[in-house]
Amino acid sequence: MRLILPVGLIATTLAIAPVRFDREKVFRVKPQDEKQADIIKDLAKTNELDFWYPGATHHVAANMMVDFRVSEKESQAIQSALDQNKMHYEILIHDLQEEIEKQFDVKEDIPGRHSYAKYNNWEKIVAWTEKMMDKYPEMVSRIKIGSTVEDNPLYVLKIGEKNERRKAIFTDCGIHAREWVSPAFCQWFVYQATKTYGRNKIMTKLLDRMNFYILPVFNVDGYIWSWTKNRMWRKNRSKNQNSKCIGTDLNRNFNASWNSIPNTNDPCADNYRGSAPESEKETKAVTNFIRSHLNEIKVYITFHSYSQMLLFPYGYTSKLPPNHEDLAKVAKIGTDVLSTRYETRYIYGPIESTIYPISGSSLDWAYDLGIKHTFAFELRDKGKFGFLLPESRIKPTCRETMLAVKFIAKYILKHTS
């Protein structure tokens, strides 16, 4: 018997169907001069290119490695245009949907147990925060700092002395929804900090003398959307006035030279800055929390992916901050320490000259607020998998990054008052 569905139900079902990326490709192109850079920009005007690196069309420049996603329908035309203009390129990913499915390459060892070797959805992360509080009641507390536009809670885990105000490090993960290895690291950090306290000399010393504030998922609505509807989603899920396009790039929404970089005012662009500084509920919740704990917080660290970099201010100007030498020293040693585990090589430097100019970033905002040690990690890899780092790479990524974070914490403990 044929089942006839009401038209409205069919429409709703189609509307919420997850986006598929069958036979979509990711190209890597290195324009040799400004003319070739302009060719890429022109292609972006007539084709729907999703820029993975750099984060937007206007950042494309000569001698920069440029990664972008192309639909199956447009990939042949793009390839032909690159060939005609004698541009060097490689195809990093031949079938994006296939890579998305291959990303889950670790089997769940014990069903129901929180896995640090797998990517976890928001529901599992919330349950995990409760579990960590129950398991370590003297060391872990959960603070609701606000809620999202879709009314999901924003939780910060405080690791350390529950009732004492001491030096602290604030860390956030998952400000961009599709960068899944970032929230995986925040979970790993909490797990290792609590598990090794009393056993690992360095971690014990750190937790005896300082607190850590961990925001495991900054962009909760976007993260949920990337799990359920569109794996490539980047922004949050707020509605934009006078536009059908959804979302703001939360890392362009901070009050740090907010409107100084052009081409961030299009609500349909992935790097849309929002209608005003701190216009987004997530941004406001984080800035309010950090302001209220400013006397404690000595370090701000934010985790992104991908490209293997350790960045520090500024993004909105080529001017170097007053303590540039100190920041560069910490970043250099941090990347050296990170490489001792698996010989993974990171580069380091100011955002503006190391990656590309950006305005409205959380890193610059925290620095200008008075937190003089602010860093952004761009985690693995360098582009082979991009945002689709396989689960089998989560633990190695977290282990090596943990070494760098512990070094930064030790340095701050010793060198700040």
Swiss-Prot record:
One of its GO terms (cellular component) is collagen-containing extracellular matrix. Its EC number is 3.4.17.1. Residues 1-15 form the signal peptide. Disulfide bonds join C173-C186, C245-C268. Its cofactor is Zn(2+). The gene is CPA3. The active site is at E378 (proton donor/acceptor). It comes from Homo sapiens. SMART domains: Zn_pept. Its main location: cytoplasm. This is Mast cell carboxypeptidase A. Keywords: Carboxypeptidase, Cytoplasmic vesicle, Disulfide bond, Hydrolase, Metal-binding, Metalloprotease, Protease, Signal, Zinc, Zymogen.
